[in-house]
Amino acid sequence: MDDKKKKRSPKPCLAQPAQAPGTLRRVPVPTSHSGSLALGLPHLPSPKQRAKFKRVGKEKCRPVLAGGGSGSAGTPLQHSFLTEVTDVYEMEGGLLNLLNDFHSGRLQAFGKECSFEQLEHVREMQEKLARLHFSLDVCGEEEDDEEEEDGVTEGLPEEQKKTMADRNLDQLLSNLEDLSNSIQKLHLAENAEPEEQSAA
């Protein structure tokens, strides 16, 4: 029977000193915490504190260069832009101004002369050119397929098909030239602005 009691009783760990059976281990707790925490119950840090401990642990693990640090070697690195309230207010004001400019249409894309309306115009021209280009390809493929299926050319005579294809190609080239000119104007306006700033 004594052997069974010995087997059931927990064995004290060799690394920990043996404590008297009736004593509780007291954990020092600040007075701001509730009284129930002073009984030795485990106290888990809040998620905010855990993140802080992780951050401090990571910063301590970072190697410090011999002549590179401006602060002392024992102080953790801090991001001043996260703690400066005036910087946050300044960024907030800048973002609100940007949002107001966007809604009013005054927002400039590349310079004073280049607005989003011009960029929208260029984008629409690009889409129009792409549609025209692919519609020409599709029309050409459909006509070739019809000729192969029928064995005989139906519809328009060859000369009319050729003149229509030439007209579509001329339209495509003129639209492409307009697009090129619009993009060139945007680039010229963008390059002219830094020259004006350097001259002033």
Swiss-Prot record:
Interacts with BBS1, BBS2, BBS4, BBS5, BBS6, BBS7 and TTC8/BBS8. Interacts with MAPKAP1/SIN1 isoform 1 and RICTOR. PANTHER family: CHEMOKINE C-C MOTIF RECEPTOR 1, COILED-COIL DOMAIN-CONTAINING PROTEIN 28B. Involved in ciliogenesis. Regulates cilia length through its interaction with MAPKAP1/SIN1 but independently of mTORC2 complex. Modulates mTORC2 complex assembly and function, possibly enhances AKT1 phosphorylation. Does not seem to modulate assembly and function of mTORC1 complex. This is Coiled-coil domain-containing protein 28B. Residues 141-152 have a biased composition (Acidic residues). It is linked to Bardet-Biedl syndrome: A syndrome characterized by usually severe pigmentary retinopathy, early-onset obesity, polydactyly, hypogenitalism, renal malformation and intellectual disability. Secondary features include diabetes mellitus, hypertension and congenital heart disease. Bardet-Biedl syndrome inheritance is autosomal recessive, but three mutated alleles (two at one locus, and a third at a second locus) may be required for clinical manifestation of some forms of the disease. Residues 158-183 form a coiled coil. Residues 1-10 have a biased composition (Basic residues). InterPro entries: CCDC28. It is found in: Cytoplasm, Cytoskeleton, Microtubule organizing center, Centrosome. The keyword Translocase does not apply. It comes from Homo sapiens. Residues 1-49, 141-164 are annotated as: Disordered. The gene is CCDC28B.
